[in-house]
Amino acid sequence: MIRIGIVDDEKQERDQLKQALARFSAENGTELNVQEFDCAAVYLAAQDRDFDILYLDIDMPQMSGMELAEKIRETNQDVILIFCTNLQQFALNGYSVGALGFIVKPIQWYSFHM
């Protein structure tokens, strides 16, 4: 089972990503456990943050996804980080925190599947 966390302040975006992940799971026979968080603070307050993959929105109030990624990297070098953003100009900054890549919003199955 692959444990996936989604941190995004927009419910619609979280729902689109969950739909893409569900489709991936069904098409590949891969079991996924997906948890969602509506802001960085809720993620940081969670008791169980042992994820294999984290999808982070870059543009969130209070703490950006980039700031959250920096905090995550202080204690976890292994989790795969993927940024989901409509701010392409910031997406490349994700590589400074060891992000695997980024997905441009709105999330389309084609871009997710690649």
Q: Could you say what each language-model-derived stretch is?
A:
Residues E36-V42, G65:
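Helix N-cap/capping motif at the beta->alpha junctions
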Residues A45, F51-M114:
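CheY-like receiver
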Residues K11-Q35, E74:
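Two-component/phosphorelay signaling modules centered on CheY-like receiver
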Residues D9-E10, I58:
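Generic detector of well-ordered alpha-helical packing
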Residues M1-G5, D15-K18:
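Non-catalytic signal-transmission and effector/linker regions of two-component phosphorelay proteins
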Residues V7-D8, F37-C39, L54:
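Conserved sequence signature across two-component system core domains
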